């Protein structure tokens, strides 16, 4: 069964709409008990790292999802759901994430006087393999964010650029994270989500 994390933040309705469109069954995950029969887990999100971490901690999902990923569960974190895979986040104030990556989520500081939040279409410097199978190398994806995961590790990752490079995709085992919104990225995003559901 596919689970979609819902802690009352973000854009879950667009994910639900996509899953209904392709007739893929899913269940809402709001407590650790809901993780019991989950084979794949999507964590969409728009919001602050601090608020999400607080809600996850209060529901017990912070530890529950961390354990799910550490046990090689198939996970896709979208935007905030990716950022929470880091060890620490500095949005609003210092908070702990799942700690899947020894990384920090920090505010972007784009060159050339570019505005924040970063909103719009940018290409991802991927190699066409794995989760990016059947997606053109120069394809654009849709981003909305002011923070990014600062990653200094050997884990698989691809960058995008907005006045400087930032991490757009990261992977550790069966856990994947994307800073962009595949559910809002038209055909390329739909293919990305299908690749995750079929992998």
Which sequence ranges carry the predicted segments?
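Short glycine-/small-residue-rich Rossmann-like dinucleotide-binding loops
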Residues: 9, 45-47
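Pocket-forming structural segment of enzyme catalytic cores
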Residues: 88-164
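N-terminal beta1-alpha1 ligand-phosphate binding loop
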Residues: 2-23, 182-185
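Short amphipathic alpha-helical segments
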Residues: 16-17, 53-56, 87-90, 155-156, ...
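Cysteine-nucleophile active-site neighborhood
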Residues: 49-118
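Short, Asp-centered acidic motifs that coordinate Mg2+ and/or phosphate
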Residues: 40
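Short acidic low-complexity segments
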Residues: 26-37
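C-terminal and late-domain segments of enzyme folds
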Residues: 148-199
């Amino acid at each position: 069964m596919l689970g979609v994390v819902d802690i009352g933040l973000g854009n879950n309705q667009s994910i639900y709409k996509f899953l209904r469109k392709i007739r893929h069954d899913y269940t809402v995950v709001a407590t650790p008990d809901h993780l019991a029969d989950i084979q794949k887990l999507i964590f969409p999100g728009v919001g602050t790292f601090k608020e999400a971490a607080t809600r996850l901690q209060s529901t017990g999902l912070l530890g529950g999802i961390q354990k799910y990923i550490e046990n090689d569960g198939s996970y896709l974190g979208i935007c905030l759901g990716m950022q929470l895979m880091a060890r620490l986040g500095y949005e609003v104030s210092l908070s702990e994430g799942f700690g899947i990556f020894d990384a920090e989520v920090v505010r972007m500081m784009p060159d050339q006087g570019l505005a924040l939040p970063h909103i719009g279409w940018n290409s991802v410097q991927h190699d066409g393999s794995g989760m990016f199978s059947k997606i053109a190398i120069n394809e654009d994806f849709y981003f909305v964010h002011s923070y990014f995961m600062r990653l200094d590790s050997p884990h698989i990752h691809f960058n995008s650029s907005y006045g400087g490079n930032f991490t757009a995709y990261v992977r550790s085992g069966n856990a994947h994270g994307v800073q962009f919104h595949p559910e809002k990225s038209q055909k390329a995003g739909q293919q990305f989500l299908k690749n995750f559901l079929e992998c």
